[in-house]
Amino acid sequence: MFDSTLNPLWQRYILAVQEEVKPALGCTEPISLALAAAVAAAELEGPVERVEAWVSPNLMKNGLGVTVPGTGMVGLPIAAALGALGGNANAGLEVLKDATAQAIADAKALLAAGKVSVKIQEPCNEILFSRAKVWNGEKWACVTIVGGHTNIVHIETHNGVVFTHQACVAEGEQESPLTVLSRTTLAEILKFVNEVPFAAIRFILDSAKLNCALSQEGLSGKWGLHIGATLEKQCERGLLAKDLSSSIVIRTSAASDARMGGATLPAMSNSGSGNQGITAIMPVVVVAEHFGADDERLARALMLSHLSAIYIHNQLPRLSALCAATTAAMGAAAGMAWLVDGRYETISMAISSMIGDVSGMICDGASNSCAMKVSTSASAAWKAVLMALDDTAVTGNEGIVAHDVEQSIANLCALASHSMQQTDRQIIEIMASKAR
């Protein structure tokens, strides 16, 4: 709980972080479908005998190539099956945390029997949409998630509607924290980070503990593309310098290796994504350790990173053609710059350079290769900080970067929200043709 004596804006900042920074086991798009299946199974009379599911094109894109934790299998069908047979309907993004070996075996058997289908919802105007319908004979239950990975909007069974979400806001009801955040500025966020009582933000240290454990697991070298472990090995061979820059990349990418490779450890997510959480957290942790920062300084740097990442990503569609590891790394750049320098000018220059560097990176679906994009984004973030410390940055005379960092962010988000929609459709078409 936060201190009710804090000013209302600061309370909304803290609520925004608490809503957007949560533990998640497994890539959040397949997990969203697993949650829909788990909730549907909880409403079903009798055991699940068959699963049908429908998802948006973007969710299909992010579910085709990613490993579901504990199963050794990729894709949405195993996520839907395991959610239905072994999911915890009350666990949100950790829906599969209690899945047993028997549940995994049963889910694989259901798949092998041809009792699980996942299709693209047509037509579909939602970017993030998942619907699971589970059957027992003629009895059924159906759950629909829209807009957010855990945002259940409709529950229905063969007996009738159980729940439906009304989107209207009651008179006098407070605006959501994200709505409030959308009207703030980076300067206001920095003021909060500098002045908020440590006790009110101490909770954010848990995000570092969770993702550091994931990073350590990734360094074992058995997950995903094992980028972190490989780069660490090259340091030992003398092919890569063992310094702060390489440590940032190694420890950050290792966490993503484990995450995308199916390790049964949760990641602390940001904006509904484990990789965004990893990218916002791990570079800041590594730099904090390098400078011997105490818990309070680490917490403040993490809050700046998380809030900056959320603030930027909130101006984007929840899923898009833009790789959001890049925007999360902009948050990390802010957090690292604050640790080293603390000045708003340094932070804004670092973010502007990031926008001038990695803004064109596409999202071609969740997979092991996400760790490559995470490593690139983390490296670019530290490079941008180093430039800013030397009073150097991509300027408003170049590309989409403006003279004001807020306008630079708006330009990037406009590009991703509008012009990159055709890019997204082309990516999905290419991936669908590969799957046929």
UniProtKB/Swiss-Prot annotation:
GO molecular function: L-cysteine desulfhydrase activity
Pfam families noted in UniProt: SDH_alpha
GO BP: L-cysteine catabolic process to pyruvate
Annotated transmembrane regions: none
Family indicated by similarity: Belongs to the UPF0597 family.
PANTHER family reported for this sequence: UPF0597 PROTEIN YHAM (PTHR30501:SF2)
The protein's name: UPF0597 protein YhaM
Species this protein is from: Shigella flexneri
